[in-house]
């Protein structure tokens, strides 16, 4: 019941021209199997990095300065995930336009109201602001409600089509593409997702789904925290509010910034202690509420001493095989890129199998790939490949 990802084969307005040819899409919302299963139970540093530090290591920040949070933070593991290339916007004042509206139930005005509510969920807790512009004007984000066959999904293997009612609900593209597509076969409503016995269809909460997809459009992938809005099954579980996990992900991606100019003054007056909820939202930097988990979800690994280097032409598909002869010993395969764990497949970019890893050679995917086969705490074997793309 995982989500698939959409990848735009050509990127315009690219920063770092070579690697944006591989811009990842946001992951897609909900599979039909997940629905059926559920039914069974009725910056400062950010901008420097954005201009070229695409291989910045995924390292946590300093120890938190807030005593009341310390005991919780030192034992938690990082839950949010970012795109492998840490794709992000280079400005906070984003515009959006609505290219088409749903044909079922919601009027254009209701649709606008629902989307605005979803955007407010993010603008209320981040430096981002969102403003709708006319459909004919250029914008950062482009929103539309589309049929099964939409835009280039039939001719592009990297952008899939929708699948009709109650299947995939929506998908979004990572920055700087800005596309957010909703399945027009769904019955969108302003209110909780529920089954309508009168109509015989599922009614889907537009605000909740849109807020999740906006998170992808800002550069966040799925969170592993059960109660996070960016969790894989957030809609199924009914979590509608942004969690601290999303805030840490935004801090990691865009820097931890105060939202108003009086934060320093408020911090001196002791608001960080007596008004923690307000100050976490408005003044995370002045109150030292910024925190990066130093613990990866899977332990990092060092590359083996013997690493094979492969020079390949851009666009070539490559597959690495690992530990096929010893998997009968019940070993488990772990994959890493540049010593950081790979935990998910990204269709059109990277595919993880039990004992193989497939990638498309491009500037984003350059690096050192390592596989480690472990049985409990014992390492059975290790392989490593260094990929370099020919210009």
Swiss-Prot record:
Residues 296-381 form the Ig-like C2-type domain. It is found in: Membrane; Endoplasmic reticulum membrane. The chain crosses the membrane at residues 20-38. Gene3D superfamilies: 1.10.10.1940, Collagenase (Catalytic Domain) (3.40.390.10), Immunoglobulins (2.60.40.10). The keyword Cytoplasm does not apply. Residues 256-290 form the ShKT domain. Glycans are attached at residues 93, 149, 233, 317. This is Matrix metalloproteinase-23. It comes from Rattus norvegicus (Rat). The gene is Mmp23.
